[in-house]
Amino acid sequence: VGSEMCIRDRYKEHAWAKWGKRVLLALVCLGLVAFGYLESLVIRGAHTDGRAEDAQCVVILGAGVNGTTPSLMLSSRLQAALDFIADKPDIPIICSGGQGPGEDISEADCMADWLIAHGVDESRIYREDRSTSTQENFAYSEEIMAELGLDAGDMFAFVTNDYHIFRAGRIAGTDAACGVAATLPRSAYYDALQLNYYVREAFATGWLLLRGN
C-alpha cells in the first residue's frame, strides 16, 4: 500500500510539473506574441508622416544635453528638423524641453542655440523650457501654438527619433500631430544602439497602452 501511495504521489508531482511547464511555455509564447505586436507598432510608425508637409508649425521634442552640447539623440533630431524646414522659411519652430540632471542649460535653449548657429532666423524660434516629459512637451507647446493663433485642429509636425514616433503620436492625442523621423548615422555601433532603443520602446509602448493612451 505504501509503495502504491508513493507511486501515486510521484505521478501527481510529475503531472503538476508537466502542467506547470505547459503554463510557463504558454506564458512565454504569449509574451513573445505581445512583444512582436508592440514592436510592429513601433516599426510601422518609424517614418515621417507625409501630411507633415502641410504643417503650420514644427515642434522639436527635447532629448539629453551634455552640459551645453546636444546629445547624439538630440543632434539627430535637430538635423532632421533643419532638413525639414529647409523649404519652409516661414514656419514657426518650437524647441521643447526643460533642464534635467547634468544639463547646464535647458534642452530648449540648447536646441535654439544650435538652430541659430546653423542659420535659422531666431525670430522663428520659440523656447518651451518647462517640460520634463513627452506629455508636457505637447501640452506646453500647444499653449505656444495657441498664442501664435493656431487652432487646435491645425496640422503641426513634431520631430523625434524614428523609434519614438508611434508612442509620441499617441501621447499627442490628436490626428493633427504629424511625426518627422530622425535617424542615427549608419554604423555597427549605431545600429546596435538603435536596436536597443527599438526593444526598449516596445516595452514603453506596452506600458502606455496599458494606461489607456
Language model region names:
Residues Y11-D49:
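N-terminal type II signal-anchor transmembrane helix
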Residues V28-C29, F84, T174, W207:
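Enrichment for repetitive, rod-forming helical segments
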Residues G20-V23, H118, R211:
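Short, isolated positions within intrinsically disordered regulatory regions of eukaryotic proteins
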Residues E39-V199:
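A structural signal for short, hydrophobic/glycine-enriched beta-strand patches
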Residues S3, E13-W19, I94, Q99, ...:
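Solvent-exposed, charged interface segments at domain starts and junctions
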Residues D191-N213:
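A transmembrane-helix-recognition feature enriched in membrane-embedded lipid enzymes
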Residues V1-I7:
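Short, small-residue-biased leader/transition segments that mark boundaries at the very start
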